């Protein structure tokens, strides 16, 4: 994976800060690179303008990542948040991401629910969180069956325990969602 701009984890900041066009321009100089995974909403707020920039540099989009982890509102989860308003906003983010992906000419949206989990035992109601998350993903994916939603699992970070933290749980989760356009990023 190559990041074309600034990235930050909980320990440090890496790379040079670049706007979207600068990142696309740098990526276009990499031999063999013809497409990018772009991030909504941090990198792409206007898919038509983004498409013009990509075309200018001869680049495409392989996938659009919907970021439901990097803002304070997602602190207690997105699709599993105990707050129905936060869950509804996560669904809207996913729907917007699906629309943007279609405009950008790709048929895949990636998402990792990294703030959906816990730091301490018994911190949240797992059954409620799981069922709420299934309902949210089902609603978003049903909105655009022509675009695939690829869900990424991760054991931890930023949570000590992400609740969809391995391939088995994520495969079961996708089975419960029950839609052909929902799968697992391996």
Give the positions of each predicted feature.
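Active-site acidic/histidine proton-transfer and metal-coordination neighborhood
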Residues: 56, 60, 76-183
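A cross-domain feature marking catalytic cores of carbohydrate-active enzymes
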Residues: 1, 38-40, 63-68, 111-113, ...
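N-terminal pre-domain/capping segments
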Residues: 1-96, 102, 179
């Amino acid at each position: 994976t190559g990041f074309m701009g600034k990235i930050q984890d909980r320990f440090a900041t890496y790379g040079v800060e670049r706007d979207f066009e600068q990142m696309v321009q740098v990526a276009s100089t990499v031999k063999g690179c013809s497409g990018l995974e772009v991030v909504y909403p941090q990198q792409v707020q206007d898919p038509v303008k983004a498409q013009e920039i990509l075309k200018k540099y001869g680049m495409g989009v392989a996938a659009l990542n919907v970021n439901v982890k990097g803002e304070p509102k997602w602190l207690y989860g997105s699709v599993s948040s105990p707050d129905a308003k936060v869950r509804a906003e996560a669904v809207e983010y996913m729907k917007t991401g699906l629309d943007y992906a279609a405009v950008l000419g790709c048929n895949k949206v990636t998402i990792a629910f990294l703030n959906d989990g816990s730091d301490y035992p018994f911190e949240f109601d797992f059954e409620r969180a799981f069922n709420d998350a299934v309902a949210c993903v089902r609603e978003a994916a049903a909105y655009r069956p022509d675009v695939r939603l690829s869900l990424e699992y991760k054991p931890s970070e930023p949570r000590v325990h992400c609740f969809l933290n391995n391939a088995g749980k994520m495969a079961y989760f996708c089975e419960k969602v029950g839609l052909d356009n929902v799968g697992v990023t391996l």
